[in-house]
Amino acid sequence: MNVQEQGFPLDLGASFTEDAPRPPVPGEEGELVSTDSRPVNHSFCSGKGTSIKSETSTATPRRSDLDLGYEPEGSASPTPPYLRWAESLHSLLDDQDGISLFRTFLKQEGCADLLDFWFACSGFRKLEPCDSNEEKRLKLARAIYRKYILDSNGIVSRQTKPATKSFIKDCVMKQQIDPAMFDQAQTEIQSTMEENTYPSFLKSDIYLEYTRTGSESPKVCSDQSSGSGTGKGMSGYLPTLNEDEEWKCDQDADEDDGRDSVPPSRLTQKLLLETAAPRAPSSRRYNEGRELRYGSWREPVNPYYVNSGYALAPATSANDSEQQSLSSDADTLSLTDSSVDGIPPYRIRKQHRREMQESVQVNGRVPLPHIPRTYRMPKEIRVEPQKFAEELIHRLEAVQRTREAEEKLEERLKRVRMEEEGEDGEMPSGPMASHKLPSVPAWHHFPPRYVDMGCSGLRDAHEENPESILDEHVQRVMRTPGCQSPGPGHRSPDSGHVAKTAVLGGTASGHGKHAPKLGLKLDSAGLHHHRHVHHHVHHNSARPKEQMEAEAARRVQSSFSWGPETHGHAKPRSYSESTGTNPSAGDLAFGGKASAPSKRNTKKAESGKNASAEVPSTTEDAEKNQKIMQWIIEGEKEISRHRKAGHGSSGMRKQQAHESSRPLSIERPGAVHPWVSAQLRNSVQPSHLFIQDPTMPPNPAPNPLTQLEEARRRLEEEEKRANKLPSKQRTKSQRKAGGGSAPPCDSIVVAYYFCGEPIPYRTLVRGRAVTLGQFKELLTKKGSYRYYFKKVSDEFDCGVVFEEVREDEAILPVFEEKIIGKVEKVD
């Protein structure tokens, strides 16, 4: 029997509707029986001379390896060949259809070289090693090595071990051609396919589609022709066109009955546009709404939309535009009669709508083609470089100007702040180095004498007329009340200036019997000066009044000198005695009363009289000088009375040190006159900022009766406190003076070690005697414990023991002013 392997006719009348395999009809073993009446024009276009296999799996297979070229009747295997492909890789590679389908899958995955290399190695091993084939074998070995092994980027080279590649390279270079030289590489590639590509092929869509349709579904033809038969390539889905490659088709164009010839081998934009209409419906009928993937890493793209690397329409309009135009309702309506002939029937419109939906599902979103980076405009360059540079320079200059303005403003604010804080009035090194003058606004809250001293500056005592200095100063202060105090480099005030300040400041005379003693009605300057003057008046009481006034003013000036050149001047005895002491609260109270004359001066200035700037007349000077002398004499009498009471300067200094840390004793009722006490309470706050300056003159002495009463009260308190403390604890507290860890007198420290813990617990318990019951209340964990407490004992050499205490009423022993115990759990 002559059996041809090509061009078997289709017997459409003998088709079966069942999917189960059937044996062939007797006498028709050589015929191909189709199980499906669908036309064969649904197949794919072949890539390299691949034909269409139209026979079914139920037809009698033609086996060239059998004696008759086919299997006899009754011996056909009931298992379809595509099911045997899933048994092993060799079963797949033994069948031509399986090889074709497997190669198609590998092409989609980009690893078809694995299968080609495997077949190349098999073919090289089958070459007989003879002299005639030696040259052919050498060329073939070199070709295999260069194409698959030498290229390090190829998939075969990547899947081959380096030792195997080195062995093949040595064989090729030394021309030691052996039939088994590629066996190791073939084994490695076969293992790779069995582990990766072969399982993926069995799960792929192309294999599942092939098995579902019983090998009758159209399939993409491979490079190698099937041994079962050949056919013509029909139009269908074109393969994916890569941007950097030119699509080629080596298949010869054969004409079919009733069919146009296949497209030419070269794919062009014009050809795609011409064949768009027939490709759209054919693709819909084949896929039935299913998507066919050409590669697992790439979205499906219909070649119709790939136009030389650029899209002709957006993705929304490119999705099956032919179907949209067919289903559009843009036809004109004929309203001549009752019929509407322009609208297609509802069934057709519904069918078109369903076709569009299926096409959208198949195509999906059409991705835009890749645009090379060189065609893209850089994002940074949006304007011309020259304009950009000008704008940048302009903005940078604006930023620089803003920063400079901010720096200047900060410098000005800093300068103003330093002026307000009295930076120019910083003291030189020495006793005045740690003190600063107050800021400018603070001068208005002080008595007139301090205001004059701060604003007039440090001037020479023998350089200018005191009256002119005073006039200039008053005018300047009234004109600019917030002026800056002069620095230390200026001149010190002279005696005339100080005397004039005292005269102008004390506008109210001291009337009444309390005024000469307490100085409440005198000006602030007199209050602060009399302690320097009265020590020298009683020695030379026969001197004239003018001389005493000049001497008093000179001594006051020497005590008020703030510059470094005045520290060598002679200081009065009382000043030297009181420089190391802080002024008492009573002194602050006496000095604070000086705000009354300043208020009167301010009222005069506001009313326009400007009395402080007027030079007093001769009669006024004489009257005020007389008042000053009267005040000096009264002060001398007061001091002599203090000395008779046996209160020396050392006691005063000690008492003042105590007074600085206690409440104001002058505020107590009964210490002074009730009205005076009220006035003093109102005038004490706020105190001067520089009242503790050691170079400032001391305030007048407080009432000695008040100081004696305060001293007696403190002594009584100390005696009461000493009687409460035991002698031993008082000695210990004196030894630990200054430490804040000493417990109060009515509490005791309790420390205990709980169940062998290395760190003790410490707490404070009220009372000196602590019982075991009180100690148990301190424990946070309740249970059965034994209690031991440390005490002094001579029984052992160590000198101490831990004594167990069991009774709750027992007093716990004390060790070094603490109760130290150990709590052990009873087993």
UniProtKB/Swiss-Prot annotation:
Modification type Phosphoserine: residues? S75, S77, S217, S468, S485, S492, S509, S578
Q: Where is the composition biased (Polar residues)?
A: 34-61, 575-584
- Gene Ontology CC, one term: nucleus
Q: Does the keyword Metal-binding apply?
A: no
Q: Where is this cross-link: Glycyl lysine isopeptide (Lys-Gly) (interchain with G-Cter in SUMO)?
A: K822, K825
Give the Low complexity compositional bias ranges: 325-339
List the protein's name: Axin-1
Native organism = Rattus norvegicus
